[in-house]
């Protein structure tokens, strides 16, 4: 168990290793330092979203939705592992996980949630690690993003979040954007600089795709 501050929930780092990377050891301190720097605003928002997505190795919208019960449990058991690695170019993920069932998505996000709570010194005073009284401003925003992504991914067909190359921002592309718009609560220092939509003829006539770019 990793040591924690008063009021901070302890994190089982061995379980975290298994959840993030079942077959290959992962250097928790490496992730922890990166997350800690970003939570203390020593790095860019685009970078923190990028590292979270890479650590999750999530491929949102990939694969069909699964069933429930024993069949879903078997799909989780047979799931291929994520294999993160670090070289001179930074973090790489060799395999992508397709969260094609709600339980599989929650399993991955829970591991990353524990990592973020541990690294940013969450100030919650009880077992609710997403306590609204937590004083870390960036953590509050990550909390919103975490919950909304977990919820909306199980409801919507597809969406993507990507880092805009050489820019301090992200690009969000979603189907039925009007319903997904509430998922992403950008800090006041960020503004929408571009918004457009186009009809995807290969989908149903009601399927509208929109992309919004957020820059600092």
From Swiss-Prot:
PANTHER family: PTHR31583, PTHR31583:SF2. This is Uncharacterized protein YEL076C. The lineage of its organism: Eukaryota, Fungi, Dikarya, Ascomycota, Saccharomycotina. InterPro entries: Y'_ATP-dependent_helicase.
